[in-house]
Amino acid sequence: MIPELIEYALQHREEILENAQSLRVNKKDAIERWIKYNPSSFEREFRVSATDGSLNFMEFRGFMLYAINAVSILYSRNGFEKEVKTGKVGLLPPSENVLERVRAQMGILEAKTTLNLIEEGELDLSLIDGSFISFLVKLRGIENDIKMFINLDPDFMEKYINAINEPKLDILAEEKATDIIGRDLDTDVLLNSMLTLEKVELLNVLIKLFRRYGGKLVAISKTSTSRRYFRYSLKPDLVIFDKLTQNTGFSKPNVVKLSLPKALKNYLDFSEDLMFTVFYARLEPREQVFRIEVFGERSMEDIKKLLDDLSVFTVRGYPYPLRRAHQEVEIRGEDMLRIYRILSLYHEERGREVLL
């Protein structure tokens, strides 16, 4: 290790640790926002799906090699029943948003496997690792790209939405967009705007999920940066509740209302606002707190029933089906190395060779 960094860490150790531990929140404030509730399981038949995705990549000077996959697993009280799984390996040219494109593509596969499994049979809840709100907030600012495509072809968005409605467990954005407009755009413009089209494809699937199965959807996040409850805290709400409460229960819920970009409302045939009930929960004493988002405005009794339902499958404070889904899809470094060897990319430069 570089000596000056060791010296700096030693000299500033107390200051750094103080920042790591500082909450700037009174414990009483956290407890006042926390509702004690001990979830109780039940004996009736119950089926739940769990969805997670994974990504990994290797960067080269001329492209990024990436791999993504997603799985939706169906569980009942008797255990595992079945799964829907898909994935993709590909190359993307360098661009300022290349990693965001990979994340969007992973999201498409997650949403499509979720929809596919729900439509295959009856289930009570569909758990998804992540946040609906985080994705929807990032849609702001895509109107300019949409207008650009409409200027190229006034019927572009209508053609595009119709094309991506194919029931395939695949990413259709680039193929369908280039079928409509060709590849005559400036490369930088095309690469940057392709992210918008991938976001539209993901949103299109999410709208189907919200419209048809909104009451069953539950997004669960193990991490969050939101400070909606404690706006002056250095730490996010999730960390505050995790550190300052120990009982099972949940935070007083917030209702979040979001609007779709105006340029998309007509094409997606979904003009109303999207409402989500957001809260933090702990399912077992002294286990971790996680963030929950459910579609629509929910009552306290709805939330308690949801926690009762989740407790049926909870192991060490977390829904086991989501833990199993994560284990199924995780793409490790050795997996990427194997793909690299299969593709025989040995002669492609990664840009760090001159440092060796």
PLM features: what roles do these ranges have?
Residues 55-94:
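Acidic, metal-ligating active-site segments
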Residues 46-56:
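Two-metal-ion RNase H-like nuclease active-site motif
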Residues 51, 94-99, 187, 191:
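Generic alpha-helix detector with strongest preference for long hydrophobic helices that associate
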Residues 1-42, 46-47, 106-356:
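Long, contiguous domain-sized segments
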Residues 87-107:
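Acidic/glycine-enriched edge-of-secondary-structure segments
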